[in-house]
């Protein structure tokens, strides 16, 4: 078994010729979100992958073996639900609204300019159809969005090496001298609570409304 314990995001730093000659391995999302797994590459070799905990493998990434061998990862086609807006009964904004509701449920979700993709779930499919969205089944690679803070560092986009501290020069007068108070005049600060914004049941409303509609897409 060939042991691979290093991950290069998108083959960073490798010459195109090396990437072209590298063996490949097709992995679906269920496998690629694991840090340890077994697989078989395009040359028929058994692979044992041991990556740091929390690693996520994306299509186009390159796994590096202990002996320096390279294996390029291909996101394998798998069953997905493809969600598109219905131009007859809605608008493209419905996709944004659907992404909001799916995100609240922590559903792994792939975002594309004209569609959403998620793993098959009949309950979610019914919910999306009730929102007047078109839901269909397909075989396609699945690359869900990563967490805002989770995967970026593993793929080299973190800011751990950057110093974001801001130095402010507060002179002695600024740091220790209070502003003078006018004599003979009380000091007070009027605090007025902001009036709550009226609730508008428009396309941006986050509530689910039962329209009693029998549309089927």
From Swiss-Prot:
Ranges annotated as biased composition (Low complexity): 193-202
Chain intervals for the UniProt region annotation (Disordered): 148-217
Any one of the GO BP annotations: urea metabolic process
Record field: compositional bias (Basic and acidic residues): 160-171, 206-217
Pfam families linked: UreE_C, UreE_N
Alphabetized SUPFAM superfamilies for the sequence: Urease metallochaperone UreE, C-terminal domain, Urease metallochaperone UreE, N-terminal domain
GO cellular component terms attached to this protein's record: cytoplasm
Tagged with keyword Cytoplasm: yes
GO molecular function, one term: unfolded protein binding
Cellular location(s): Cytoplasm
NCBIfam families the record matches: PRK13261.1-1, PRK13263.1
Family: Belongs to the UreE family.
HAMAP family in UniProt: UreE
This protein's name: Urease accessory protein UreE
Gene: ureE
